[in-house]
């Protein structure tokens, strides 16, 4: 996915989260392990969100690999330590297609 398409998908995902009661805390947080597209907060739970975009749901979901999720988890750990946060959190994915947006909460390896 090109950076421009990625930005559009991340903007749509951010708007989706805001419309569903989340507060956007940070975007594009980088560590040596990888990047977190969106860090959001709702009901005392922090959400580290990977955004995937494709023409259809299946293509986007296939891009959430074990390697990508492992990098997301390691980067989330860095964020928590850097900010001295001792909070409830989960790792999510948001799938963006031209027609729909899906929020997959608490994804695991």
UniProtKB/Swiss-Prot annotation:
One Gene Ontology term of the molecular function aspect: nucleic acid binding
Pfam families hit by this protein: UPF0102
Cystine connections: none
InterPro entries named in the record: Restrct_endonuc-II-like, tRNA_endonuc-like_dom_sf, UPF0102_YraN-like
Protein family per UniProt: Belongs to the UPF0102 family.
Annotated PANTHER family: UPF0102 PROTEIN YRAN (PTHR34039:SF1)
Name assigned to this protein: UPF0102 protein Suden_1901
């Amino acid at each position: 996915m090109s950076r421009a398409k990625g930005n559009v998908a991340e903007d749509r995902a951010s708007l989706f989260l805001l419309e569903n009661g989340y507060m956007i805390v940070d975007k594009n947080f980088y560590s040596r392990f990888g990047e977190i597209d969106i860090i959001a907060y709702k009901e005392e739970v922090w959400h580290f969100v990977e955004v995937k975009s494709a023409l259809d749901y299946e293509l986007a979901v296939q891009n959430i690999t074990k390697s990508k999720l492992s990098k997301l988890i390691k980067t989330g750990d860095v964020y928590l330590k850097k900010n001295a946060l001792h909070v409830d959190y989960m790792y999510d994915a948001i799938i963006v297609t031209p027609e729909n947006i899906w929020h997959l909460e608490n994804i695991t390896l």
